[in-house]
């Protein structure tokens, strides 16, 4: 299987989505970090007893073997164990739905004495807020949410940076000039990734156009397969996805096309089709957060990490990726790390011709967190949004 967001009501209104529909879709949403009043400091957390490890728990939306979103989180959990050794003891519960079950699992984790608890999907937010209020000495971390509390932080990854880099490769290698994206749920995170993929492709090949098929779920391999097949039948020779299984890449492999992995390295699922994987490495953030708790320096905040922090990368490039694309990827990575390059810098127009960023204007995180339009080159309309 994302990846922080502030103005949920505004964003849902912009997308024409009901809150209930979002919850029903399941999984993650990003929150664009923006300035906010810091919450009051939480009560001092109970330190581990002498010789006792820090107990850290993870609640996962999917199975650890999904090959994508949850797989990436669990790899980061393992990295925490490797980094800290006997200073920590980690546990996890997989396939926890975004329902009352989430509250039950989180509450059990707190009662079991876990001092740091990670919830790894957007829909856990109300449950984490409730449980955090009842366990003020426990630290909670919520992936892709936008609300915080004195003992609850929110964090996300800039997945659009990986999408842009995948676009660079796709734009350089397409033969049909038609690219396809299998999209999950029409929220700003996913729309932003589609657009960033398109912008990256256009930076190498202005003639490309991008088709999108929405499956309205995060993890549904049969639907993802159907969507990928439809895109290929529609002329797309390279596919990207913002869904959580390996079905899209596997379909590209089966039908003789190319594609990318998402969230985790998916090379093994389609070795001939695979061009690269836009991966999230949660381990830098998880190691940082555990260290903060161990040092007594943890504080509630909202963070959005990307290439600069080592959280996002495009890995396992295919051997036939041309040198021009490789060179451009290096420039982009270096620029993102230094802060000298901005993916969302004008002039940028939506696909109706309306200017959304003027010449030289750079999007801030609030803008990025509210995207509900397609850029030029993307066909069709955002479901419930603008053309």
Task: Show the residue positions of the predicted features.
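Periplasmic-binding protein-like
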Residues: 113-121, 141-143, 234-243, 260-262
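Extracytoplasmic "Venus flytrap"
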Residues: 46-51, 55-76, 80-84, 91-102, ...
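Hydrophobic alpha-helical segments within soluble ligand-binding/sensing domains
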Residues: 155-177, 278-297
């Amino acid at each position: 299987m994302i990846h922080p967001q502030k103005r949920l009501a505004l964003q849902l209104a912009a997308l024409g989505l009901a809150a209930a529909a979002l919850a029903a879709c399941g999984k993650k949403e990003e929150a664009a970090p923006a300035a906010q009043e810091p919450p009051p400091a939480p009560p001092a957390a109970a330190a581990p007893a002498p010789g006792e490890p820090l107990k850290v728990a993870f609640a996962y939306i999917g199975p650890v073997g999904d090959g994508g979103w949850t797989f990436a989180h669990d790899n980061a959990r393992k990295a925490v164990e490797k980094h800290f050794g006997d200073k920590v003891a980690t546990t996890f519960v997989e396939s926890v739905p975004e329902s009352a079950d989430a509250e039950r699992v989180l509450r059990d984790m707190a009662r079991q004495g876990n001092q740091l608890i990670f919830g790894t999907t957007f829909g856990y937010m109300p449950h984490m807020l409730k449980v955090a209020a009842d366990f003020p000495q426990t630290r909670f971390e919520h992936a892709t949410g936008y609300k915080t509390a004195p003992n609850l932080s929110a964090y996300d990854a800039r997945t659009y940076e990986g999408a842009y880099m995948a676009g660079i490769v796709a734009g350089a290698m397409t033969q049909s000039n038609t690219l396809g994206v299998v999209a999950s749920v029409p929220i700003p995170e996913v729309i932003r990734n589609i657009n960033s993929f398109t912008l990256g492709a256009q930076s190498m090949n202005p003639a490309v156009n991008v088709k999108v098929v929405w499956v309205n779920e995060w993890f549904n391999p049969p639907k993802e397969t159907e969507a990928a097949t439809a895109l290929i039948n529609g002329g797309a020779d390279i596919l990207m996805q913002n869904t959580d299984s390996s079905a899209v890449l596997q379909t590209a492999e089966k039908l003789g096309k190319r594609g990318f992995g998402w969230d985790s390295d998916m090379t093994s699922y389609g070795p001939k089709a695979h061009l690269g994987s836009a991966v999230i490495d949660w381990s830098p953030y998880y190691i940082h957060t555990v260290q903060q708790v161990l040092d007594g320096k943890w504080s509630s905040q909202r963070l959005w990490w990307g290439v600069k922090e080592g959280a996002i990368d495009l890995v396992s490039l295919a051997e036939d990726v041309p040198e021009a694309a490789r060179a451009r990827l290096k420039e982009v990575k270096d620029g993102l790390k230094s802060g000298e390059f901005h993916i969302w810098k004008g002039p940028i127009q939506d696909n109706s011709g309306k200017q959304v960023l003027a010449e030289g204007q750079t999007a801030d995180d609030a803008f990025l967190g509210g995207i509900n339009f397609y850029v030029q080159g993307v066909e069709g309309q955002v479901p419930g949004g603008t053309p």
